[in-house]
Amino acid sequence: MKANIHPNYHRITVVMTDGSQYTTRSTWGKEGDTLNLDIDPRTHPAWTGGTQTLVDHGGRISKFKNRFGNLGM
């Protein structure tokens, strides 16, 4: 096996949208970093069956609507 090809695997804290948090191991960030979620399994419409509005990060939803909004579906 090749040495030093795998990313660093360390502990981080994940904060859910309701403020609850848990510690897990990840390759994201650095040891001890905190990952704040914008949407999680408790609030995502795909898992809750709700009709909450999606957060438009980087204008992706707006860009899609501008491009395909005139299809009239």
Swiss-Prot record:
Gene3D superfamilies in UniProt: Ribosomal protein L31
Swiss-Prot/TrEMBL keywords: Ribonucleoprotein, Ribosomal protein, RNA-binding, rRNA-binding
Pfam families: Ribosomal_L31
Molecular functions per Gene Ontology: rRNA binding; structural constituent of ribosome
UniProt GO cellular component terms: ribonucleoprotein complex; ribosome
Highest taxon of source: Bacteria
Biological processes per GO annotation: translation
Function summary: Binds the 23S rRNA.
Subunit structure: Part of the 50S ribosomal subunit.
Family: Belongs to the bacterial ribosomal protein bL31 family. Type A subfamily.
PANTHER family in the cross-refs: 50S RIBOSOMAL PROTEIN L31, CHLOROPLASTIC, LARGE RIBOSOMAL SUBUNIT PROTEIN BL31A
Protein name: Large ribosomal subunit protein bL31
Species, as recorded: Bartonella quintana (strain Toulouse) (Rochalimaea quintana)
